Amino acid sequence: MEKLTEQQKLEQRRLGPVNKAAFRFMVGLATVLFKKKYGVSFTYADDIRPYRGKPYIVVSNHASRVDYVFTAPAFWPDTFNFVVGYNEFFRSHLAGVLRAMQTVPKKNFVQQPYAIRQMIRIIRGGG
């Protein structure tokens, strides 16, 4: 049998909502490690409390490879799946974490039905 490429492995994954305990642990760890270092603070333009625990989609501006440091704590304690650039799955120090956190790989600047299908799957699964 032919060995699968990394792209084939990624595209065969069937994603679901992120594990809440693992997500909250990672957010807590990132907060401890990076919040003070990067001076992260939050100012809410809208009251998001009515949305807590309900399904919603977060669309954020791309800041850097550490977007999660700015995005995830702002919505605490809610959890969500990130959509991350496909190329990030080839970084050895990130690949395992991205897979464990049910992160959706998305190729940059192209339409990718796989990513859309996985997002729909996650939403239907309660994520």
Predicted regions: what they are:
Residues 2-46, 92-101:
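A transmembrane-helix-recognition feature enriched in membrane-embedded lipid enzymes
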